[in-house]
Amino acid sequence: MIDHTGIATDHPTAARAFYDAVFAALGGGMLMEVPKEYTGGKMVIGYGRDQPVFWVSEQPAGPGRHTAFAASRAQVDAFYAAAMDAGGSDNGPPGLRPEYHADYYAAFVHDPDGNNIEAVCHAPA
């Protein structure tokens, strides 16, 4: 079981605005910002609902990563709209993905650093 994960960003201001919007749509938010005296002056912020589970760190971004967040169908739709409004780019609008399984309802966007970010619901309609 994964406790937390993270990504790097070359665009800290854009990444913060993007993930603030995305996590608000998923019922969460930015829960922690590591003081810059501990990070060499770089942004390190943690997002989640009850505890930080997704970290965004200002450092050279590597190859794009894929991260999927568990959501309801309504949250998948809200995630996609919020991500697009916050500067994300489309990588698959909300809808069923039967190639994965009959109830796989998801949306995919690229964040400002090109990471493939997904919200997914596995529950039947």
What are these model-predicted stretches?
Residues M1-D3:
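Extreme N-terminal starter segment of soluble prokaryotic enzymes
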Residues A8-P52:
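Core segments of cupin and vicinal oxygen chelate
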Residues T9-A14, A68-P112:
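Vicinal oxygen chelate
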Residues Y38-Y80:
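Long, continuous compositionally biased terminal/linker segments
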Residues P98-E99, H122-A125:
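A short acidic/small-residue loop/turn micro-motif
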Residues F108-H122:
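A cross-kingdom feature marking charged/low-complexity
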